[in-house]
Amino acid sequence: MKILIVPVVLLLTLAAQAADCPKNQPKTEAALLELEQNWAQALGRHDADAVACMVADEFEDADVDGSLHTRSQMLEHIPQRKPGSNHLTEMRAHVEGNFGFVRGLNEVLDPSGKIVARVRFTDIFTYRDGRWQALAGHETLLGEVSR
């Protein structure tokens, strides 16, 4: 009996997490821009569950140092992120059918509000199951920030 309870509890937990993901998002540039802001805020809160709703199972990211990260690797790293926040600017979105992308600039701030990095990013999305999901991301570090 105990053997059956564990898988059932696990399935219910996964279903509850999936139920919290947004539904019926519009297929608009504005929706993608809002998603990027929500993603940045979730990273600042170290909220891996919120980010998990925003990235597709096959998500891959090319980091500023050129290393590649899968969805699970990226999500596992979120709780270990340094304290701080992300300030997104210069964002542009484009939607073509079920695909879209956002390009922008992320100013990474330390807890005092000082800019510690400037990162140009491009995120590619697909519209699936009534919501936008990131398929891929790429970041480029824009020079060193004086400390």
What are these regions (language model features)?
Residues A19-C53, E58-R147:
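A beta-strand edge to alpha-helix "cap/lid" segment located at domain peripheries
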